[in-house]
Amino acid sequence: MNNLRPCVFALSLYTAISTTSGAFGQTNELPRHAVIGLQVAPANLDKPEDPVTNPATIKVVAAGGAGEAAGLQAGDVLVALDDMPVTTAGDFAHRISRHLAGDSVTIRILRQRAPMSITVMLKPRPYETSSDAEIVYTSVSLNGAYRRVIITRPKTSGRHPGVLLIGGLGCYSLDGELTRPAGYGPIVSALVKNAFVTMRVEKTGEGDSNGPACTDPKATAELEARGYVAGLRLLKTYDFVDPTHVFIFAHSLGPLVASLVVTQEPVHGLVAAETIGRSWYEYSLENVRRQSALIGEPFDQVDAEVRAHAICASHFFLQHEPADDVSKLGEQCADMIRSYAGMPSLYMQQIGDLSLAKQWKSADIPVLVIYGTSDPATSADESRYLVEIINSFHPGRASYVELPGMGHDFARYDSQLEFLTRRKEPNKPHPYDDEVVAVVLKWLNEHF
C-alpha cells in the first residue's frame, strides 16, 4: 500500500492565522472571535502528521500578534492547549478560532526538547478593509444559531450583480479571504474591483459563526446548504443588489452542496470549478486509481489499491457505517476517513447519496464548469461528464473551459504529479493562475 493519502477536495490544510488590524463597514450582535498570529504545520511536511513522531510545530510567528507578545517562537512544538493534547495543526487552529477576543489560553510546548507553559492573551480577528468596497459584517439565523455573513458592497451607486462564494471540503473560515494572495482571494478581489457584490457565509462553528462545530455530527451537508440558502435570500433584499442577477461561484466539493442550494433558492447562474460529475463513491475509486498511477505504482498494485478502497467506500458510503468503525477495517480505510478533513460521517454520507443528475434535472440555469489540467484531485472527464448531465436536461446551458497547468488551488504547476507532491518542495513558488479570474469575469459579464 502506498503512503500517499488520497488528495481530495481540501483547498488548504495549514493556513496562517491573520494578525492585521483594520476598520470595518458594519457588524452585528455576533462577538468577534480570536486569532493568535501563528502559522502552524507538522514538523516535517513530507511525512504524515502524528502528535508523537511528527507533531504540530510553530513555523511562523507573525509580528504584532498575540503569539509574539507571549514569547512563542518558530520551532516550538505544540503539546497541549488548555491541558488538552494538540493532535494536529488543524486541531490547534480550530480550537484557537473558537475562542473570543480577549480570552487567555495556556499552551504547553517543547522548546529544544525542554517543556514550557506559556499563557497567551488572544487578539480579535481583524475586520477586512477595501478601497473598492464597503465591507458589511452581518449574519443569518438558522436553527437557533447565527452564521457570520461577509458582504462586499461596491462604492458606486445603483444595483449590482451578486456572487455567493461556496468553498470546498473542510472546516475553515473565509474571513480575511479578500486580501489573501492565494485560494479564493484573487477571485473575490477581482469581483470586488469589477463592481460585483460578493457574499461569504461561514460554515457552522467557523469564524464568528456559532452553532455546532463544523466537525459535529449535527453539521450535515443539508445544514450547510440551508445556510447558503438563507444567505442568498438575505443578499436579494439589499437595495444595492440586483436580485435577478445573483450567481454562485463554487469550488471543489462546493458545487455538490450548491446543487442542494439551487433547487431551494433560484440563482441566475453558477460557476463550478475543479469538481466532479459522478457520485462521490464512483469518483473516489477513480481518484485512487489516478493518483496511485501518478506516483508510479505498478498497475497490479494500483488495481489492489482500488479494490481495497472499494471495500472501505462501500462500508462508508453505501452501507452508511460510522467513520470510526470504517477506520478500524484497515489502514487504507483510516486514510480514506482522514482525507475528509474531519467532516462528520453524516455530512460525507449525504454528499455520497447525491445524484447530480437528479439535482441538475431540477435546476435550469447557465453553468460554467472549469477544470485545470494540473489538478489530480479530479479530472477533465469528471468535468465534461457534469456538462453532459446538465446539457442532457437543459440543452446548451452548460459550458466547459479547460485551463492548462492550473492545480486544484488555482495556482500553476508543471503537472498533476507536481501538485500531488508539492509539499516536498514547500519553498518552490507556484504563481496564481490569473486566467481563472479572467474566465470567471468574462462568463459572468456575458450573463447579466
Where are these regions (language model features)?
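PDZ/PDZ-like peptide-tail recognition elements
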Residues: 26-62, 98, 121
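Conserved PDZ fold ligand-binding element
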Residues: 67-90
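N-terminal cap/lid segment of alpha/beta-hydrolase-fold proteins
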Residues: 124-157
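Alpha/beta-hydrolase active-site loop
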Residues: 217-238
